[in-house]
């Protein structure tokens, strides 16, 4: 079997869950360059990119996007830089609520390689579809100016960021044995354990699995906020789960979700947006997990692993 024949399917090798970005005084950017280093977990010969404006209120234009082999976090081997195109075009407009998938990029990749994805937003762009995540494999950089085809971002005018805007998922065309594991949840999963799980699989020789993070801080299973104060806490599980588990090559999902349903309600006398009527019963939670998550996952052929809710004794709603 030659190299081309051994690659048979698309599998997600990196992913996040864009949501409503925090409401800051400035929600627009122009002439902005984003660069995201990404660890490759499979061998493959093609790569493609999903971009999302799922929570955007205005269309956004990606003026240019490129991928290249990373030298370090900020630098790319210029000889390897390739344009990411969309129907043959080097730019694309993503409508509010929309998503786009790039053309395939021919690129010989090996497990353990690092690539950098660079996105240039030349026009005024509403930065309202992104996610804040942390971990040793989750860092990005931004600078003003178009560096999409440049080797290095300028040291004195570049800042690091843990905000990942618009880039949703990266798929690689790889071997049939490979599959994706989805880690779904809230701020617990937006923190660093999925990155350490990915590193652990790499170090221990589990070379057929990728870890795809779908985490939005503050989200609940059964309810969502309709006020601007907590807009960034995102959609409830009923709206999220089916979309976020639509992952190429996925074989299983770890669900670590539900603690916010319990700890958010405090009573209107404390916080007008967090009435005690939002507090679910145990049966509400069981039904929510079963009906919204487990049934959906199994209909997609996914194995389901449920994380235990973390201890909350002493929390304000512990005995409610």
For the regions a language model picked out, list residue spans one by one.
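Small-side-chain structural scaffolding
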Residues: 43-44, 65-68, 183, 194, ...
